[in-house]
Amino acid sequence: MHKKQSLFQISKRDTLPLSKALLIRGGILLLALVFCGLITTILTGKNPLSVYATILSGAFGTSRRIGVTFRNVAVLLGISLAVTPAFKMRFWNIGAEGQTMIGCLATTSCMILLGDKVSTPLLIVISLIASLVAGAIWGFLPAFFKAKWNTNETLFTLMMNYIAMQLTSYFIIIWEVPKGAGKIGIINQDTRAGWLPSIGNDFLLPILVVALMTGLMYIYLSYSKHGYEIAVVGESQRTASYAGIKVDRVIIRTMVLSGSLCALMGFLMTSGIDLSLIHISEPT
């Protein structure tokens, strides 16, 4: 009996010239724009070109909009970089939102509780350390359970997002100003205690931090021993064990790093961008 052949088969190309790769991506982008334009016209009756023009104007229409756009891109890129080591290890860390939010919460706690007790430079250092530790703990927990009991990291990290959300909601109610407002407003607005200094403008610091993170992450994954171990574990945990790599240690170490870097972005958001505690899915 002959095995039934599937109608479509997908196989990975060994090599693809850069020019052809760019042509394919450009064609896909063009098709996506055309398709979205058709859907927009059908649903709203508006000219898709005017809709695209409005989108571009909203993102790049003024110098401030350009700065906000690049700042937001930098934050998203930073969070993407944070989960890169885990994904390279094929540990599906879906908890970046919670790890970032717990960094925001740790930073906010330090700014509110220590704002009038220590100097701003010291407060910034304390807030940074607190956020990194909080993110490391948030990354450690699913990694430890995965390493010891082979739990499903996707569900574990996803569920921890909701814990971080509820903790954030709870402390927003505790610290809300004024009572009943459902938000805490700008933290230390009068003293600016714990605020990161502006470099050039309000948008440049996150961009510089993420640019530095990008370079360091490339070096870490491409040229360090840890990066090599992450790659081997990602390809095959059994092969990694045969090679003498302690897989459990690599899993835990990598997720601690991933959680800490997510929390670093939370620190930047709280002490340098929003200057408040919000759910990170809210618009800023």
Residue locations for each model-derived region?
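Hydrophobic alpha-helical transmembrane segments
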Residues: L22-G27, T69-V73, G98-I102, V125-I129, ...
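Membrane-interfacial amphipathic/re-entrant helices at transmembrane-helix boundaries
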Residues: H2-G78, P121, I126
